[in-house]
Regions:
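Alpha-helical/coil-rich non-catalytic "connector" segments in signaling and regulatory proteins
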Residues: 1-130
Length: 130
């Protein structure tokens, strides 16, 4: 097996990360990394990705719209969802509850990282180049 979510969490870069939900999925292999910049991200992923987001793409959507987006992501069988904390997002508590529900149902790891942590420090993605 290749590089897994557990391998990613074991990296020094992720020492301040917090695994919120989906611990049962940390053995999933990572096949790529994608930043969520728009709600239609599901069109551009094939599965196995780690998705990075500050939830900005979902800033103003309703909880119902957000539930639909997350359901589509779950169908794609992403390897993990990494959420950068500290963003102001409408209905944040409701949206996090939706993420928790799907993470527990599908075992998709949800990892929270501090706001000040850079998403891609130099050299951090070298493990995908092997």
């Amino acid at each position: 097996m290749g590089f897994t979510v557990q391998d990613m969490l074991d990296m020094k870069l992720f020492q301040k990360a917090n695994l919120l939900w989906g611990k049962g999925g940390i053995g999933q292999e990572i096949r790529g990394v994608t930043i969520i910049e728009s709600p239609d991200i599901v069109r551009f992923i094939s599965g196995g990705e780690v998705l990075l987001t500050g939830l900005n793409a979902f800033l103003n959507c309703s909880p119902e719209e957000f539930r639909s987006y997350i359901a589509e992501l779950a169908k794609k069988k992403v390897s993990a969802l990494v959420i950068k904390q500290g963003r102001t997002v409408d209905f944040l508590e409701e949206k996090m509850a939706v993420i928790q529900e799907y993470a527990q149902k599908t075992e998709i790891p949800v990892i929270e990282i501090p706001f000040e942590m850079p998403s891609f420090p130099p050299g951090s993605l070298r493990f995908f180049l092997a």
